[in-house]
Amino acid sequence: MARQTPISNYRNIGISAHIDAGKTTTTERILFYTGVSHKIGEVHDGAATMDWMEQEQERGITITSAATTCFWSGMGNQFAQHRINVIDTPGHVDFTIEVERSMRVLDGACMVYCAVGGVQPQSETVWRQANKYKVPRLAFVNKMDRTGANFFRAVEQVKTRLGGNPVPIVVPIGAEDTFAGVVDLIEMKAIIWDEASQGMKFEYADIPADLVDTSNEWRTKMVEAAAEASEELMDKYLEEGDLSKEEIIAGLRARTLASEIQVMLCGSAFKNKGVQRMLDAVIEFLPSPTEVKAIEGILDDKDETKASREASDEAPFSALAFKIMNDKFVGNLTFVRVYSGVLKQGDPVYNPVKSKRERIGRIVQMHANERQDLDEIRAGDIAACVGLKDVTTGDTLCDEKNIITLERMEFPEPVISLAVEPKTKADQEKMSIALGRLAKEDPSFRVRTDEESGQTIIAGMGELHLDIIVDRMKREFGVEANIGKPMVAYRETIKKSVEQEGKFVRQTGGKGKFGHVYVRLEPMDVEEAGKEYQFAEEVVGGTVPKEFFGAVDKGIQERMKNGVLAGYPVVGIKATLFDGSYHDVDSDELSFKMAGSYAFRDGFMKADPVLLEPIMKVEVETPEDYMGDIMGDLNRRRGMVQGMDDLPGGTKAIKAEVPLAEMFGYATQMRSMSQGRATYSMEFAKYAETPRNVAEGIIAKFQSGGKKGDDE
């Protein structure tokens, strides 16, 4: 089967935004105008097509990035048909991981901002992730029909808050309830959308007299931005004072692809105005798969040679599994982005991360949660495969004759955990299946069994994250569970270097045990130490035989899992084995593993050990009247206020760093202090030393409950 759409006419885009910027409504309109969805789904009714998990519809927030395909030939059918693959991404900070993983497979992004709220906290997080993956982007300022809407303020905030370089290509006609359409600065005409056809039809009109000066001013800025793309354009602009429509588009496109500028548009998705022009901008300014840097990976050879795969059907097949979902009808759905080559139904694929060969069952393309079967997918496509058993998020799939491992995704360590217990014996088995599946779908969610209590502990990125996991266990798998109180993921580390002997000797008649080591423990930078540990050896003259180095390393690492102070994992330590002794008969791996473990345990307590706690970046938006109460409350929670911003309408944004341990139940407290008018967002910032008075309480509690961290 030949390719239906040339790869140069593909656009793989993500739509990302802060919670209430109207992202799902914007995506809905995209599906409506591109002819996929005939009844517009409104989030207010809990009926949006993209929000396809029940909880998302109830909570009105988007949790999972559903991938959808649609086609667009321009508002006035001025382009050849383009295929746009849209990945809807969540706007809540607990789901930053979802944004991260969709950024990884996108070629371009459309940032949606609220014309009233402007650039909000989550927008900054998403912007940073887009920078990290060098994703070209444009911005759409939505909700121009709302009271307090101001397009130019949002443009200014992209500059000041995000460090972006925004270039508006439209200016709004009116605002709030007088918002009527936009002036297209490239065409220098007003675009008026027809309300009777829900914006499917439009007409060009003359620019309203009161907007002529504003339009000229912003057009000049836009043309200057385009001229900076090349010397030829700049020379022509300096000579003639203007550029042609084609030159403006080419200049802006080149600079957008180089991530030097961000084209900005505006509209009201709810009122069916502006999304159509934004779709045209996606085609005009965002890259096709062939215009982004070829994906890089590592070949399957001794030297782990770096290699890349061009976006071409002729290249060997390579794809990245970026999301796994459990579907009650077909089982596991693995969403893949194909970077090169062709994959047909029934083909074998190789997973170099797991060293496993699998066969593709069905290939389906998703439109929100409806699916269409495909015979094959090609370079640039995003689709879901059915029947893959051992694939997890971030794995590579490739042709087994041309093995390549694409760059892996990095997932953050969870910062909050809680115990879950099934209510009945019947729930026990269902719960372990449910948690296994959910952990496979979401790499930032972890499940483990506490060795002492035997309890099942689930860990994630925030309270909402774990709430939703528990909710999904109940809805999708019918598991009733009792939930414990949330627990903070503390860590332990040291502040000074020590040298420590560790000895393990057992004589019981016959063959004994003998392991003897000297280990140096040194602190590493705690700021960086999410999970850091280094092992080195400086043994001279064979005092410890080489074959036991690994055992010493293993003994130390196992001991680090349950720290010495309060049983929490140890981070930020460099351990160096530098001396010891051995016995020809009695020494073995186990003896040296135990000797390493003892040296670590005893040395740790002499090295000025401290407890680390997760510190969260908290941003509260509140009417000025409640600011004093909110600031006082943050201080009581050991918060450090970092700064304040004035927002429109007398609202203040307070930025602070607060220990996670003090943030439980914050939402309820904040609502009651502000009569429900304040909102907040929270994301992990760093680990920092826990104040002594707080740490003493945690350590005392641990010690009175029996020494979890001791192995003698």
From Swiss-Prot:
Descriptive protein name: Elongation factor G
Encoding gene per record: fusA
GO annotation, biological process: ribosome disassembly
Top-level taxon of the source organism: Bacteria
Family indicated by similarity: Belongs to the TRAFAC class translation factor GTPase superfamily. Classic translation factor GTPase family. EF-G/EF-2 subfamily.
UniProtKB keywords: Cytoplasm, Elongation factor, GTP-binding, Nucleotide-binding, Protein biosynthesis
Residue ranges occupied by any tr-type G domain in the UniProt entry: 8-290
Protein location: Cytoplasm
Residues that hold GTP according to the record: 17-24, 88-92, 142-145
Role according to the record: Catalyzes the GTP-dependent ribosomal translocation step during translation elongation. During this step, the ribosome changes from the pre-translocational (PRE) to the post-translocational (POST) state as the newly formed A-site-bound peptidyl-tRNA and P-site-bound deacylated tRNA move to the P and E sites, respectively. Catalyzes the coordinated movement of the two tRNA molecules, the mRNA and conformational changes in the ribosome.
A GO-annotated cellular component: cytoplasm
SUPFAM superfamilies tied to this protein: EF-G C-terminal domain-like, P-loop containing nucleoside triphosphate hydrolases, Ribosomal protein S5 domain 2-like, Translation proteins
Species whose genome carries this gene: Acinetobacter baylyi (strain ATCC 33305 / BD413 / ADP1)
UniProt xrefs under InterPro entries: EFG_II, EFG_III, EFG_III/V, EFG_IV, EFG_V, EFG_V-like, EFTu-like_2, G_TR_CS
GO molecular function: GTP binding; GTPase activity; guanosine tetraphosphate binding; translation elongation factor activity
